[in-house]
């Protein structure tokens, strides 16, 4: 029976050591994989505060206020501190543990009476677990890597917050201009409507012309309502980011979107420049934490040796309690491998956690590469659309003037003029949106690469 148990234990330990070797190879391959992206990233200058390239002091203040007041970022900071406390707690197992106690008792014979017998005792104890197999060190390392991962989580939250603040800031700037342009359109159509009413009164126009002009006015007013609702939603988003309540004013004078100079994107920087992304750093840290946890759990097979010492004292009077000191020592050895079934499954659980962390890390690399690639493409398309929108607006202005002249000459209907004018006004709004889309797209690139990249000179 003992031989069978011994053989079973040997097989289990051998299997565990084999699994350890496989996980070690997998972990080293993952580190090598991250290293190649890190080396590519080092070839470029990185400006982490990319929003300052817009040279908008007001935007800078808004971002600073968000970093100071945002609740999601505050919660992420608390998570970082908590992980640090856990890491310190795990590290405490590497140093001796002290404890002490005192006790005073009084006894009296209730039958015979007399004086009470009073005694005072005290003890001071110390224990220390020898980390012969570095199990405790691996546990502490796992906790430290977990702390580093939460730091990167906070950086990811910060990165997302900044991107949201910048894009929402310029979204409101765009919507303000769209509202102003739409109000101009309403005035334009209202003027036409008034002219048609006067002509109708003079008998030189029919009622359908008045109806068509008024229809254009109402359509423009509905567009205005839509833009105002969108601005209110954007303001709500910005207020949430800045932690401002409805009765607190934004105190922001937004720029005109067409006057904002686009920073641009260096498209010569390869999409593989992703090592600065905090989410990837976080997944890499969690992978390291899981690996160290596997190492620590696998060492649960090995004996644990604990050294202990104590110093005890006693006396009948408090001031003489330290006159009698008794020292003691202890050596404890635990054999966890005897509980091999529990240890085995704990090892399996830690290995499964490692594999999950490895897959999450590998997925984060793929997602990041596709993220940058898609954002590059979106930026180039946004620039093209902005250029096309500007050209289209010029053509639409000409077409509107053409139909206006034809109407005034009596060879074209009002409907054709209004249709052309509506197309022109819409293309004017399209320019504003296209410019905002360029800013939004370039910020998506900066966010997905965690900074603005330029070639080192």
Swiss-Prot record:
Its main location: membrane. It is found in: Cell outer membrane. Keywords: Antibiotic resistance, Cell outer membrane, Ion transport, Membrane, Porin, Signal, Transmembrane, Transmembrane beta strand, Transport. GO terms for cellular component: cell outer membrane; pore complex. Residues 1-23 form the signal peptide. Disruption phenotype: Mutant cannot secrete leukotoxin and is more sensitive to clotrimazole, erythromycin, ethidium bromide, cationic detergents, bile-acids, anionic detergents and chloramphenicol. It is a multi-pass membrane protein. One of its GO terms (biological process) is monoatomic ion transport. GO terms for molecular function: efflux transmembrane transporter activity; porin activity. The keyword Nucleotidyltransferase does not apply. Pfam families: OEP. Homotrimer. Probably part of a complex composed of LtxB, LtxD and TdeA, which forms a single transport channel across the two membranes. The periplasmic domain interacts in vitro with purified peptidoglycans. Belongs to the outer membrane factor (OMF) (TC 1.B.17) family. Required for secretion of the LtxA leukotoxin and resistance to various antimicrobial compounds. This is Toxin and drug export protein A. The lineage of its organism: Bacteria, Pseudomonadati, Pseudomonadota, Gammaproteobacteria, Pasteurellales. The gene is tdeA.
């Amino acid at each position: 029976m003992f031989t069978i148990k011994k053989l079973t234990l040997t097989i289990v330990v051998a299997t565990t050591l084999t699994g350890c070797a496989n996980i070690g190879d997998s972990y080293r391959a993952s580190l090598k994989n991250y290293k190649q992206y890190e080396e590519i990233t080092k070839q470029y200058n990185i400006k982490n505060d990319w929003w300052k390239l817009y040279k908008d002091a007001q935007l800078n203040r808004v971002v600073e206020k968000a970093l100071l007041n945002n609740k999601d970022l505050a919660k992420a900071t608390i998570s970082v501190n908590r992980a640090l406390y856990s890491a310190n707690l795990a590290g405490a197992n590497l140093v001796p543990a002290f404890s002490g106690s005192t006790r005073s008792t009084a006894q009296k014979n209730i039958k015979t009476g007399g004086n009470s017998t009073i005694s005072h005792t005290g003890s001071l104890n110390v224990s220390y677990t020898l980390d012969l197999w570095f199990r405790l060190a691996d546990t502490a390392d796992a906790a430290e890597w977990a702390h580093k991962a939460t730091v990167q989580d906070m950086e990811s939250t910060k990165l997302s917050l900044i991107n949201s603040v910048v894009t929402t800031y310029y979204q409101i700037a765009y919507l303000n201009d769209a509202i102003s342009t739409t109000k101009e359109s309403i005035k334009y159509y209202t003027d036409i409507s008034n002219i048609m009413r006067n002509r109708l009164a003079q008998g030189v126009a029919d009622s359908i012309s008045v109806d068509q002009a008024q229809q254009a006015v109402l359509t423009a007013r509905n567009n205005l309502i839509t833009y105002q609702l969108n601005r209110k939603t954007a303001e709500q988003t910005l207020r949430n980011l800045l932690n401002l309540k409805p009765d607190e004013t934004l105190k922001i004078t937004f720029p005109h979107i067409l006057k904002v100079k686009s920073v641009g994107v260096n498209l010569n920087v390869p999409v593989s420049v992703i090592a600065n992304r905090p989410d990837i750093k976080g997944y890499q840290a969690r992978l390291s934490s899981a690996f160290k946890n596997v190492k620590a759990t696998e060492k649960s097979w090995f004996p644990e040796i604990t050294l202990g010492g104590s110093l005890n004292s006693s006396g009948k009077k408090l001031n003489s309690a330290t006159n009698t000191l008794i020292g003691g020592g202890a050596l404890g050895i635990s054999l966890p491998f005897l509980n091999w079934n529990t240890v085995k499954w704990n090892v399996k659980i830690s290995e499964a956690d490692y594999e999950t962390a490895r897959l999450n890390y590998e997925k984060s690399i793929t997602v990041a590469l596709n993220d940058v690639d898609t954002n590059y493409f979106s930026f180039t398309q946004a620039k093209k659309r902005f250029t096309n929108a500007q050209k289209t607006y010029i053509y639409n202005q000409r077409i509107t003037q053409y139909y206006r002249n034809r109407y005034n000459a009596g060879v074209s209907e009002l409907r054709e003029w209004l249709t052309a004018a509506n197309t022109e006004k819409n293309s004017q709004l399209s320019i504003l949106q296209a410019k905002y889309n360029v800013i939004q797209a370039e910020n998506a690139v900066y966010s997905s690469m965690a900074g603005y990249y330029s070639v080192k000179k």
